[in-house]
């Protein structure tokens, strides 16, 4: 018995030594590349931060920030980013519904899963160009509506300031929902079947089962997806807006977002210092938003599992 224990202990020590050796070897390979990336990223961040306090080479303190945060166009851009955040709950709900539906649809699940995920892997500029044509005044959508007798519903989807931002958000939702479906579906498939079988025996229906069992079980995945999409809406929609509005954020700044504002300040208005100040402001605002989001979701998760 003692001999067996010694052999087990020796094997554990050997395993730990091999693991430590593998970790060191991996660090040797990854370290140089990681260091280069870190230096480049750090240099870029420091350069932007310093530029935000300068103008034409002179130190101006917070003057650039004052100009930016009092610029009506920048405030409009921030408001539009905030409105795009309203798409996050829609994405979460749609992804959850599609994920549980695919989970219950055993036949053809692979095909449907691929079809739903396909938009997510398409390049954003390609998606924006295609939908830009579809949503034109004489585009495919309006042609279809007129052909089925719904001409009153035909709109200038990208030319009407009141609906242009909503139109673009529909494109973002179409592209991003597949990512959430795959994340949630992968987690659902890993859950034990015994729980679902017990729920069926108790007479629980489709939605009761998934709202009472599936939703709490995959809440961490839902939170992760929500955070990723919130970051997307705040700081990753430039390509959609630039392509679909021809780089103008129009009509009449109706689709102006913070990223496009920074781009235009830096490259069109030749004011890189103002662009740097706007970028720093956006970074800090995004960081605060993410911290608040994580805290709220942590409390939600704790409340769910303490019930």
Features from the language model and the residues they span:
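Short, Lys/Arg-rich, polar N-terminal cytosolic tail immediately upstream
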Residues: 1-22
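A structural signal for multi-pass alpha-helical bundles of membrane permease subunits
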Residues: 22-307
